[in-house]
Amino acid sequence: MFINSFETKIKKKFSLLYEKLDDEDENEPSSSPSNSTNNFYKACPEDNSSKWSKISFNWVTKLIMKGYFKESLEMNDIYDLPELNKVQTTSKLLDDINFSNGSKYALIKHIYKNFLPKNKYALISNIFITIFIFLSPICLKFLINYISTDNDNEKSILKGILLCCLLCISILGQSISQELFYWFGMKNSFDVRGALTAKIFEKTLKLSNVSKKKYRSGKIMNIMSIDVENISEFFWTYYLDIVSHTLQILILLGLLCYVVGPSGLVGFGVMVIALPINTMLCTKSSNYLEKSLEYSDSRTNLTSELITNIRPFKMYAWENLFINKIEEQRKQELKFLFLRVLFWIFDHMMIETNATLVLVSTFATYSLTGNTMSLDVTFTAMTIFANLKLPLIYLPEDIYKAIGLMPSVKRIQNFLKSSESLKSKENNQNINFNNNNNNNNNNKNNNNNDDNDIIIENCTFQWNEPENNNLFEFNQSEDEEENEEEEEEENEENIKINENFDYKLNDINLIVPKGKLTMICGVVGSGKTSLVCGLIGEIYKLNGSVSGVPNNISFTSQQPFLLSASLRENILFGNEFDIERYKKVIESTALTKDIVNLAGLDLTEIGERGINLSGGQKQRISLARALYANSDCFIFDEPLSAVDPEVASHLFDHCIQGIDFKSILKTKEIKKNVENETDSEELIKNEIEIENEIIDVNNVISDKNDPNLIEKAKLLVKEDKNEGEVEFNVYKKYFSYGTSGVTLFITISLFFIGQAVYKVSDFWLAIWTERSIEGKSDSFYIGYYLLIIGIFVSLLMIRTYSLSRITFGIGKNLHSALLKSVTYASCRFFDTNPSGRILNRFSKDTSDIDIHMLDLLSEVSICFSELTIGLISIVFIIPIIIIPLTLLFIIYYIYQRLYRPSARELNRWESITLSPVFSLLQECYNGLLTIRTYKQESRFIKEMFDNININLGCIFYSFAVHRWISMRLEVMGCIMVFFTSLAAALFTSNNGLAALSVTTALSLNGYLSWGVRRIVELEVKMNSFQRIQSYIEIPKEGNKLISTGTNQVDSDGLKTISNGDLVNWPNKGIIEFKNVEIKYRPNSEPNLKDLSFKVQSSEKIGIVGRTGAGKTTIASSLFRMVECSKGLILIDGIDISKVQLQKLRSSIGIVPQDPFIFTGTIRSNIDPFNEFTDFEIWESIEKVKLKDAINSMPLKLETALQENGDNGFSYGQKQLLCLCRTILKNFKIILMDEATSSIDYHTAQLIKQTIQENFKDCTTLTIAHRLETIIDCNKIAVIDSGQLIEFDTPSNLMNIPNSKFNKLIKSQTDYSNNKIK
């Protein structure tokens, strides 16, 4: 109550100052242009501040006051970064790294060469630190001499005050130098961090197909977060500390020899003997950290794969399979992290033991050589030892950082040296960071190539990198010794991949004439996509020549790449908005009707990978992007495979056939060879009946200034930011994951007991010096001193080990809970949160919990136990000191209350602003081919630079706020030392205790600021816990079972049907939809409206309709990927909403529209639970016509596949592999969603026969645009705008002249007419 009243008064006192500062801030000019998208808008106040303001950090006061009065900071409260610290500037310093000499230290040498000269002020500050460290013990020696003098004539008050002032000046000088050293060092670290992050992203945009196999997105995220942080931390202060701490140790040992004579050399010898042991322990700790990072990479990659493919994982009911795989990697990661911590504990134990042995050996030698332990000698030596203890602690840590730095340097250097796409080398010459890259495709490049035919002569293309590759600008040969071990590990990991899939296109000859349509046809897996990639420079050309390829190419990939942005932004793709051209493109791609049905029209956010769109809509948006780019050459890879015949005909007429420039259509549909030349009119005759429904294209273009429409258009939710202090319940929740309250209390108590024991050792030295126990020799005092220190070291080991067990248990349980919670979350969660944001919880936030929480909890406990015991000791010795200490405590409280809100909020913004960095990295990684083809690298680099600058801005001002509080509390500490030393000199009769009080005050000086900073840092890391906890508490899918003894309930408390009741379910396969309504968003229009139909046992149902009509939504509802808002879905008479999800999904077979291959072998992809024999697996492989392809691979079923199977199979073959796994299992109900859309006509007919033979007793729902795929079904369901408009046999529907199905039949192209007739 008193504290709240006091704080209210303080706020009133400061309110006028805040208003004045706020008015000044509002009048400050903007540092960003008016059209800038940067969230910062005010220039950095440090740039225009006075020298005194820079030294005292007064320029940060405005930000401090904002945070205090608002209790929260918004992004527009944070100032802009100084221009010199922006990544646009710092990244240039890494532009010319020379890897050609094969040096394993090339990166680190380059950083030293380019970044160290900027850090001269840090070096100067470090020199002053060393000088003041030397002066403070000398000043203390004179002061203790004064205190121990019994002659009143020599003990004038003025002399005492002067000596106290000199001591405080030396301490204050050291403190100011230390803070400036940290600040200048941080700026250097900051620049290194920004530059490396930028370079890693730039390199990601250049990765070749071979490099992508090695560097999955999860591994790159780990490199960008963990490894970059390791290097930047080293270039904060550690690189200078190695020299300065060594120098400080030598100076202090020299000073020790000055105080105690040659006895100091004995202590020096003990230290020299012990230092190699500490170094060895640091090295072992570093090795275990490197091992843990390898498993962390693997865990993050698997987690990334799970998150980005969460829908197929859920549909196949494979969540537990991947959870177990991730947990296994996590177990190994924690194992090596714990071993690292054990050696860290031993290291700290050795440091404490070493410091004590140095002190005891020095004092023992000094005493045994006939010298008397006087006050000035004892306590001056104690102060020297106290000052010596820090460099003794930090020098092994500096060495550890230097040793631990090399694995991170190696990982980043190898990544930056990895092979690049040939296309990226071509594009890199034209990258311009000073514009938005809006015109690179709009204006035709007047290159001679644009008017020529594309000619490919005698070319051989290959996916894998040639053995002697001379296609790169730098030499790939590396230091053999450095890379030998890594190459062996890489071979073990990738031998199955690299040896098996050396796919080549041999002796290719092709002419693509300007102004004509060229079609590339072939059976599945014949190399069509490889040829297209050869044209655009994405695979290696071993021989031959390619000429006439224009600079501007529009490209649509077989699996469309879409940004997590609005539909309009996906079409514009960085180009300027031309409304007339935009309208024309929308009409040409038949998107008008689709856009009208979207909540925010063309400004609707379509989500990562177009998650809320149908396959046909995604393809048409990709096609619209190609047309809008207005390029010289258009390359379409299967642009019609996911659209219905009517739309396909429209697209062919208005998009593909109507282009005036070079255009290439890659398809498996036209049964002609490349060698056969004929006009496109002869290949495809369009007999399309245009739908009568006409929609004005003007009605689909949104007004960006309409707030209601913008709100409706949003899909992604804003990331939550915790505000205010971290409450006690948060800490309680954190510790509940790993320990009981009793264990925690005992562990924390050990810190206070340990510090009390250590303080007893100081009292014992005072007793020893005063010879308070008569008749006892020095060996008596030495023996008991060693006993006290032995108890302290034992307590240190016990408390640190106990705390490490607690934190590691918490980290393990927290990650497990996070993984399960996210995996079992509803699909809506993944629709509204980008994968980069989710992965941030598993990388950066998890790393904070694993690595930093132990250190922080230990440091906070040490700090406050030391402050508590130390202050009690001082007050016990000098009771009068409580008066100035109370006043100092009040000031201390005010400062920490001013400081904590801003520091806490800035650190929270740091975590939040890191998510867009990871999200953009993930997004660009998935769309490298499209980004490079459209030459959009510079646009995404600029966006990434902006994201990095925003994140670095939060770090920059967070650190400035830390220095602000440190500077002020260090001054307070000096004042405390002054009053304590003055009171000891004037008011204490016991000279030994007086000297002890002064040395205690000196030791507490740094703890005042350190304690507050550690508390705020702990609050920040608890923010990582809160972010993880918020994901643990997200709503789960229904019917995820929670064990409650013998009974089972689902996560929403509803009773479910147990698996025991559904042992043979479904045994008939009867499916019934009753008035089903489905909504993807709560307030949106239904995607399925009042849908009712019934499928009898073993019936074959074909589901057709215009692209985006709701066909795939039917599939999603059957698997409960989205729950019914109205109505029921029954299978064999049982309401599926009451069936456990695991049981439901594992009981229905699925061949998804987008083929799903996960990281593993061919065998594990077909039979993930190892349920079937080799014979059964090969039998199913033969049925889907993949036997020859897999048999040609040396390792056959054990062939390793990467995520999405990009290293082994074509898109069509991946579809066949998915069909294979479905045939293998005996499902009663099977759903096929465009199962053969990317397979050539001949193979599709063979697969159709296989399906008829193997699924004859199954109930099948087949979604297809190829009408010949479903023409033999028992019934056809025609879906339009989410409604069932026709449901009858094919023959009956065909006999109705105006039926929708009949119209679809008529619009089918000639390749299907033969079958239909």
Curated annotation (Swiss-Prot):
Residues 490-710, 1071-1306 form the ABC transporter domain. The keyword Cytoplasm does not apply. The keyword Zinc does not apply. It holds the Pfam family ABC_membrane. GO terms for biological process: response to cadmium ion; sorocarp morphogenesis; transmembrane transport. Residues 119-404, 744-1027 form the ABC transmembrane type-1 domain. It is a multi-pass membrane protein. ATP binds at residues 522-529, 1105-1112. Residues 427-449 have a biased composition (Low complexity). InterPro entries: AAA+_ATPase, ABC1_TM_dom, ABC1_TM_sf, ABC_transporter-like_ATP-bd, ABC_transporter-like_CS, ABC_transporter_C-like, ABCC_6TM_D1, ABCC_6TM_D2. Keywords: ATP-binding, Membrane, Nucleotide-binding, Repeat, Transmembrane, Transmembrane helix, Transport. The chain crosses the membrane at residues 127-147, 156-176, 249-269, 341-361, 375-395, 734-754, 778-798, 871-891, 969-989, 992-1012. One of its GO terms (molecular function) is ATP binding. It comes from the Eukaryota. It is found in: Membrane. Residues 426-451 are annotated as: Disordered. GO terms for cellular component: membrane. Belongs to the ABC transporter superfamily. ABCC family. Conjugate transporter (TC 3.A.1.208) subfamily. This is ABC transporter C family member 14. It comes from Dictyostelium discoideum. The gene is abcC14.
